[in-house]
Amino acid sequence: MTNSIEQAWDLAKQRFAAVGVDVDAALTRLDTLPVSMHCWQGDDVTGFEDPDGVLTGGIQATGNYPGKARNATELRSDLELALALIPGPKRLNLHAIYLESDTSVARNKIEPRHFSHWVAWAKKHQLGLDFNPSCFSHPLSADGFTLSHADPEIRQFWIEHCQASRRISAYFGEQLGTPSVMNIWIPDGMKDTPIDRLAPRQRLLSALDEVISEKLNPAHHIDAVESKLFGIGAESYTVGSNEFYMGYAASRQTALCLDAGHFHPTEVISDKISSAMLYVPRLLLHVSRPVRWDSDHVVLLDDETQAIASEIIRHNLFDRVHIGLDFFDASINRIAAWVIGTRNMKKALLRALLEPTDMLRQLELRGDYTARLALLEEQKSLPWQAIWEGYCQRNDVPVDARWLDAVREYEQQILSQR
């Protein structure tokens, strides 16, 4: 470490030790908590299936910042820079539309070989991979229904797509030695008030059971399902509601995905974690930033991001909660978006690990809510930034906003040529 950072580090460790926090133990734990970065920030959820395709499914990437990745080589290059600017363990989350093939491949015919380059790249960079079927931006999803579609042939197409995706996910886990979390999200819903809310959910229930019917090694693959309140064009009814997927995950013992932007604006997923963990074996978190709706803004180090991290740490949910990010902002440098959001998630985890939780819990058990509030607020002023800077330097990444210099240089030399 540089002298000034080392001095600040030593003083900060003393401050935390005074309130019973072991900084070294906290950093050891932090190094076991990977954050899964989402590949789709790099190209505005376009994928490689149809570069001129239109994004559908009630989601939007707004903006037109130059330098968008146009193929797998460019996307991996951009990711490599972002990964080099973020300390600690990371994973990469892929969608099915990021396959690589010299010929057109129907989505229900995708195979592990179409993702072999991603696996080789992940091995090189010591990354785990996660996966998602892509049930949007496709002619057979154009009317707003996929796994709950009333047409059995269309429904079967999407069932087969999800089944193929599970095999790819298991391939990731087997090849990389760490389980791939495969999350199923579908856009199915209606713009206006439906007459029959039940039948689409019955079809979805049956379709999901068929999707997960093939037994896969849990050391290689984990199933997750994700709810949503509404989307553009599906404002009045969403088939895969919170209640539907909570019941499904609990009854089938799959993982449940909680997306920070998929609930009413007055709801927060940090308050849902402890309840859900009583009924489901695992949680997948999509940490995002909804601004008045599921806008998928870049994650900030704000109250909710911190609350999410604190819930994981306070309740020792390290082995049951998988942390992923889900945002896509096309109005700013896309590499910077990855770096900002992922570093903020890691900062939140570090701050949670540096909290004197045992002390605060004892105050709560004694009913001393005055001291609990006082100390909870005072600990926010403890010098966690000095520990963060030391952690960055230990991991050979820029300590502060100097990472932006590397992004600007890359933008000038590489992105500006696209």
UniProtKB/Swiss-Prot annotation:
The lineage of its organism: Bacteria, Pseudomonadati, Pseudomonadota, Gammaproteobacteria, Enterobacterales. Coiled coil: none annotated. Binds 1 Mn(2+) ion per subunit. It is found in: Cytoplasm. Transmembrane segments: none annotated. It comes from Yersinia pseudotuberculosis serotype IB (strain PB1/+). Belongs to the rhamnose isomerase family. Its EC number is 5.3.1.14. This is L-rhamnose isomerase. Keywords: Cytoplasm, Isomerase, Manganese, Metal-binding, Rhamnose metabolism. Catalyzes the interconversion of L-rhamnose and L-rhamnulose. GO terms for biological process: L-lyxose metabolic process; rhamnose catabolic process.
